[in-house]
A protein has these predicted regions:
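Catalytic cores of the polymerase beta-like nucleotidyltransferase superfamily
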Residues: 1-446
Length: 446
């Protein structure tokens, strides 16, 4: 991380240039110029600035306006085209560039791909009426906006407009906390106001190799009882964010050590074996997993993490957690399928391929992958063969072929096609001619 002396506007502008693609940087300068023309201070605030300073910057950032962000975004759209989406209650607007924007902008840096979009936010203050409540929002100053942040490391702002481009604004000790590697809230009631910050504190601590400040550990211990007052959706969202991280195993272990997991729900387990399973997700996925889908809207890593973490629980415990933490239907069913599968794996270890396929075909593929990662050695070969080969075995004969042979549509179709697949799986058929001979016999039987 650069020293305090290196964080002058020129050096910050240089860091920004290194972190952003040319098209984003050019558009940022354009937006900064537009803000100057309207007399609006414009900033990047929070996580992007934090990550810029520790060398991990991405492309996800909000542009904070000391003024009316919605009006500013609409004026940009009127001048440069694109679509604006407004959330008036929060004073936010999203500007998505489109082909019309490309025609109006004289920037020769655009390349094919996803067109940039920018989120504009009015500087605002927040008030929490009671622990765990969503905040009441109203327009405010930059100081107000920084003061509503969760941790001091997220209170750094980078000014963009005019002569101030690259100026680092640090009103609340964020730079010192970042340099010391401390996760610290802004005020003693912070964890009580929003108990999800407890989970976020651990997430930041483990992601960056920081330490939660000693006084914060005391505040967390006093506030963790308020986790029970949060909705299942909010808690699950925080768990989703943790499970998407590379250091998810360390994060969950830390939460367990602080007695936070049982504070979320008494049935949430943790042990060293689960830690090793989640760490295994850092290894490249086997080739046999090609084509394995996500669990609908749940990314594959997050879905697998839930399955490895909770998939050995009893069905009644899974149902309880799924209800309390507002799991999606697809995650609930995958967990229940995996729980049942674990009980059957010993019997599948020496079974015929057709028996294995009959048992696994109704199980979500991601649950089969989780079983492969967590199963004892005797079950590994059948799970690997299913994922790599057996699930793709199909007879050459189709329903259209049966129609051509004069067989009227009905239950016999499924019986015939299933019998042909079983014969291929169990090695009873070697050639297409073998299949045709068996097909003739099956048609005569029905």
């Amino acid at each position: 991380m650069p020293s305090h002396e290196q964080l002058n506007p020129k050096e910050m502008a240089s860091l920004l240039k290194q972190a952003l693609p040319p098209v984003h940087l050019a558009l940022l300068h354009l937006l900064a110029d537009e803000a100057v023309g309207r007399g609006l201070p414009l900033y990047i605030i929070g996580g992007f600035v934090r990550d810029l300073l520790v060398g991990r910057a991405g492309l996800d950032f909000d542009l904070v306006v000391e003024g009316d962000a919605v009006t500013f975004a609409r004026s940009i759209s009127e001048k440069y085209a694109g679509k604006v989406t407004v959330h008036a209650h929060f004073g936010t607007a999203n500007w998505q560039l489109d082909s019309g924007s490309l025609a109006r902008l004289n920037i020769p840096l655009f390349e094919q791909g996803v067109l940039p979009m920018f989120d504009f936010v009015s500087a605002r203050s927040e008030i929490y009426t009671h622990p765990g409540a969503l905040p009441t929002v109203k327009r405010g100053s930059l100081a107000d906006d920084l003061g509503r942040r969760d941790f001091t490391i997220n209170t750094l702002a980078l000014r963009l407009d005019g002569e101030y481009f690259g100026q680092l604004v640090d009103l609340l000790g964020g730079l010192e906390a970042l340099q010391k590697g401390l996760v610290r809230v802004l005020h003693p009631n912070s964890y009580t106001d929003d108990p999800t910050r407890i989970l976020r504190a651990v997430r930041y601590e483990q992601r960056y190799g920081f330490q939660i400040a000693p006084e914060d550990l005391e505040l967390i211990a006093a506030a963790k009882s308020h986790l029970g007052g949060l909705s299942g959706e909010r808690l699950r969202h925080e768990l989703d964010l943790i499970l998407a991280e590379d250091e998810s195993a360390a994060m969950l272990a830390r939460l367990n050590g602080l007695d936070i997991l049982t504070g979320i729900h008494p049935l949430l387990p943790w042990d060293a074996h689960m830690s090793r399973l989640l760490e295994s997700l850092d290894e490249p996925a086997p080739a046999s997993w090609r084509g394995v889908p996500d669990l609908l809207h749940i990314p594959q890593r997050v879905g697998l993490s839930y399955l490895l973490w909770l998939g050995r629980l009893a069905p009644v415990a899974i149902q309880e957690l799924a209800s309390c933490l507002d799991f999606t239907a697809s995650l609930r069913e995958a967990l229940l399928s995996l729980s049942s599968l674990h009980a059957d794996l010993p019997d599948l270890a020496g079974a015929r391929p057709s028996v294995v396929v009959a048992r696994l075909d109704g199980v979500p593929l991601l649950a089969v992958c989780a079983a492969w990662l967590s199963a004892d050695d005797p079950a590994h070969p059948v799970l690997e063969n299913y994922l790599a080969h057996w699930r793709r075995v199909k007879p050459k004969t189709s329903g259209h072929d049966l129609i051509k042979r004069g067989l009227p549509p009905g239950p016999a179709y499924q019986l015939i096609l299933s019998s042909l697949r079983t014969a291929w799986l169990d090695g009873q058929l070697k050639t297409n001619e073998d299949e045709l001979l068996l097909l003739d016999k099956l048609i005569k039987l029905v």
